């Protein structure tokens, strides 16, 4: 068994199924007619700096460069920002540095990045600072006239890229952003449509589903990863164990260390590229939470109430069977030699040792549940999320947090602390977070969310499709 879904038979078939589903979705979207809008701004006939009429676009006249100039006029009657930033180029000419998607200028289509501005309302911009020009354009109302030299570089097609945010971001708290007002605030898990990424440090994006149509600046993945890596931090403490097999032991450490190079890029998270798929069935329900938060009660309730839908994979152990235990029912009993051999062959999804005995869950056991068209329930350590979050297992990952009600005992405070440690490190993997104020309430919310996820369009990692 390998970690990549595409390398195994089961993983390959699931990868292909999701790829076909995505292709069908794209074809259906492409067949729909697209709306066309016409901006209401007024653009005059082209003029030339030497005063000549349009002569069929000569490049030079008498050895002098002919620069094509356009007069752009539009009315600004509100306090709405124009949605552009300016800069001085190497010739100290005022040029358009950035156009925010959805802003006034973007909607009009009157300016483009790189356009050189010569005059604003008849005033030459020479010898004016960028701050002065930005302020003048912001405060001006009524009819605005701009004399510009268009950027002759070819226009790139609009991006069609969506990213899932893996961190919280507030531009007002960011000292690196060039313009805090132009920043886009978002939270972990938000889907961001990337509009422009010409700037290597600051991309433009818009939160999907937001009522705000205009785009804002977000740190690029490179900038965010550099920022996080540059912050001096003390060595991170080990995440609290939430495994039913107890704390991870040397066998598991060895196993995870063997594959750590595969996931090195996940140590510093920023964004994850995603695609939107039509509804499809999630094959695995993963419960994550600190030890003692109540995951076992939730899991057992799901199994008892929905035996035809959910199945818990029977784990393997080297512990000798007790008198009342039947092989293959509570556990699969195998020798230490066989389990060690299976571990070396990467057949275990997760494993550990407890009181001198080894316990673990095999990939094949989960696959057999899927072949029965049932949903496998896993309660695993958060470190294992990197392994199970594949198209092969198609998991729906639910984080169970401790109650925020009742008396704050010392035990509850410790549980909340352990829970927050898991959340802070692994929240970008979660599809759903629930506070366990009661098993019945939590169970109802979980099942509703799971059914909704399986019956609605879903954002999934692009690696599940391509």
UniProtKB/Swiss-Prot annotation:
Gene: MPP1
Phosphoprotein recorded as keyword: yes
Record note on quaternary structure: Heterodimer with PALS1. Interacts with DLG5 and NF2. Interacts (via guanylate kinase-like domain) with WHRN (via third PDZ domain).
Main location: membrane
Location(s), subcellular: Cell membrane; Cell projection, Stereocilium
Annotated region described as Interaction with PALS1, given as residue ranges: 268-466
Official protein name in the record: 55 kDa erythrocyte membrane protein
TM spans (from-to): none
Membrane topology classification: Lipid-anchor
Domain SH3: 158-228
Function: Essential regulator of neutrophil polarity. Regulates neutrophil polarization by regulating AKT1 phosphorylation through a mechanism that is independent of PIK3CG activity.
GO BP: regulation of neutrophil chemotaxis
Entry's Gene Ontology molecular function annotations: transferase activity
Sites of Phosphoserine modification: 13, 19, 52, 57, 110, 243
Domain Guanylate kinase-like residue range list: 282-451
Phosphothreonine modification, residue list: 49
PANTHER family according to UniProt: MEMBRANE-ASSOCIATED GUANYLATE KINASE MAGUK
Pfam families, alphabetized: Guanylate_kin, PDZ, SH3_1
Positions of the PDZ domain: 71-152
Sorted UniProt keywords: Acetylation, Cell membrane, Cell projection, Lipoprotein, Membrane, Palmitate, Phosphoprotein, SH3 domain, Transferase
GO CC entries: centriolar satellite; cortical cytoskeleton; plasma membrane; stereocilium
Sequence positions bearing N-acetylthreonine: 2
InterPro entries recorded: GK/Ca_channel_bsu, Guanylate_kin-like_dom, Guanylate_kinase_CS, MAGUK, MPP1_SH3, P-loop_NTPase, PDZ, PDZ_sf
SMART domains: GuKc (SM00072), PDZ (SM00228), SH3 (SM00326)
